[in-house]
Structure formats: C-alpha cells, structure tokens
Regions:
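Primarily short, surface-exposed interaction patches in extracytoplasmic proteins
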Residues: 1-203, 220, 229-234
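Active-site Gly/Thr loop motif
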Residues: 214, 218-226
C-alpha cells in the first residue's frame, strides 16, 4: 500500500517504503554463462532511493529507525540485517516467535501470522512480548524457543474439547486440530503403504519433506492437490 500512497490503516508513509527499498538500490543483476543463470552482485556507490510522491532522495532506514551510516563500498543489505536483528528492533523477534507459535499451535498469537500490524493485535500481547524478549536475550536461539513452546502446558492440552472450551477458537484453552502439511501427509502415506514416491532427478528414497525447492510441485499431483505452497509471491 505505502508504495503508491500513505498506508490507509497504518502509520507507514511512502517515505518509509522508499527508505526501506533504498537498502536494495545497489543490487545488480547480470547474465551468467548459462542461458538461465543470473548473477546477483553488489554495485558500489551511495545507497539511495527516490520518493516518487515528491521526487526527493531518501537514504536507507528501517521502519521507524534513523538512517544508518553506510560507506559507498559497503553493501547496504548488511545494514538492513543489522537493523533487523538488533535487540531494540520491535518487529523481527515478535514476527519470528509468532510464526513458530503458529507452526506448533495451528494459529498465531497474531492471526493471520503474516499480518503483523497495530490494528491486528495479538490475542495475548503480554505472552507475545515475553516470548520475543526471551528470544532476544537468548541470542535468537531457535532451538530454545522450540523447546519452550513444546514443553509448555499449552502444547500439552488435549484437542478434545470440554464444556468449558468447546467454543474457544483463539484463546488456546485446548489444542486446535490442524491439517498435516502436504509433504508430511505424503510421507505418512508412503510409510503406511510401504510404497515410496519417486521424484525425478533426486536419489531414490528422497522423502517429500526433503525436497530442496518448490519446483517439484508441478511433478507431484499429490503435493499440488494437498496444498504445498509454490512460494510464487510474498502474499
């Protein structure tokens, strides 16, 4: 939304959009030796973008953050990564632990999990904040957050509802049944039937959960029907 106009429901402006896009202004692309080979490289120079609303130049900056000092020889994407993983960044840790929560509990504390905004608050903001703070303090220990979630009392809840939580659909008073991912379901069927699904170009015995990318979706009717995402877009 903020590319063409100020965001209608959030605080982000077009300037915020172009400041974020400026981190990628020095990314170059060239053809490789092979027909379908692209080479992505860093172009030297000052990273900047043009705010198309008023045609003013803007420097790279994270959302709600000051512009970092980036030398002309430095890759501005490194500065973006530094901002994303900074302990005072209010976005990365919250988004990360929310996605892990969605993976294990079937629904994020913020739902949908890719719609993190002030006008779509978490059902338990204190819990999300506590998980994010612990994730940061641990040095972004992914195994640690998995261990905490899987050892929690909430994760141990039965999926069989009782008269107190039968109507609950978002407070996590019970475990919500969720559909298996397409890859997991295919591997489970292979195990039960003792018949292995083969994938052209990969070694025999390769399981669906081991596929290196999504190009195999078109070669597997099962994965296509049962919803393995193509990752063709970010939305």
């Amino acid at each position: 939304c903020a590319q063409c106009h100020h965001h209608p429901f959030e605080k982000w402006s077009q300037k915020d959009y172009y400041q974020l896009s400026a981190f990628f202004s020095q990314v170059g692309r060239a053809k490789g030796r092979l027909p379908d080979e692209d080479i992505i490289y860093h172009k030297r120079g000052v990273a900047k973008a043009t705010n198309k609303k008023d045609n003013t130049p803007v420097q790279p900056a994270g959302l709600g953050a000051e512009s970092p000092v980036i030398a002309s020889d430095d890759d501005p994407r490194q500065a973006l990564v530094d901002w994303m993983s900074a302990k005072d960044n209010p976005f990365f840790a919250h988004t990360f632990v929310n996605r892990y929560w969605k993976h294990f509990f079937g629904r994020g504390l913020v739902d949908p999990e890719d719609d993190m905004r002030e006008t779509n608050p978490a059902v338990n903001p204190e819990l999300l904040q506590a998980l994010a703070e612990k994730f940061i303090e641990s040095g972004f220990d992914m195994k640690g957050i998995v261990r905490d979630l899987c050892r929690s009392k909430t994760y141990q809840f039965s999926s069989i509802p009782n008269r107190y939580n039968a109507k609950d659909k978002h407070n996590f008073s019970r475990h919500y049944p969720q559909r298996l991912q397409a890859e997991v379901l295919l591997d489970s069927i292979d195990d039960l039937t003792e018949v292995r699904t083969g994938f052209s170009g990969l070694p025999a015995g390769t399981r669906a959960t081991m596929l290196p990318d999504n190009s195999f979706n078109q070669k597997s009717y099962f994965l296509s029907v049962f919803g393995r995402p193509d990752n063709a877009s970010a939305c």
